[in-house]
């Protein structure tokens, strides 16, 4: 099992560099998605690690968007994170803002989940309920095909 900082320490590190509600909510969403995928894909023993990677994946984005995934290693080391977690976090920027290639299944899940949660979240905010709980998959597929909808979410990455 991989070493991981506590969730409390991860949240403190995240909040040190992120204050915007959107960024904090995105981090919490990706954390939950990563935990779910860890269990779903047979990595339940590593669910906390996967979730922490999801929580911290954009630690540097709010304050240093032009250095995204490049400033992260410094911030994560300062928070007590190990090399496995740092590599995983940086790998979600592969081909976009860094050259750290996702090699582990968890890193590939993060690569896609980051963009996908943005698309799903944008679709949910358009609904009267502001929730995914009553969203039909067909509605999401329709929005996915519209390149103008959530244009910042890379369909190629998804």
Language model segments and positions:
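Short helix/strand-capping connector loops at secondary-structure junctions
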Residues: 151-158
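Residue-level signal for pocket-adjacent positions within structured domains
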Residues: 9, 144, 153
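Acidic/His-rich, divalent-metal-binding segments that scaffold phosphate/diphosphate chemistry
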Residues: 1-64
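Residue-level signal for secondary-structure boundary elements
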Residues: 22-25, 121, 152
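Divalent metal-dependent catalytic cores for phosphoryl transfer on phosphate-bearing substrates
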Residues: 43-150
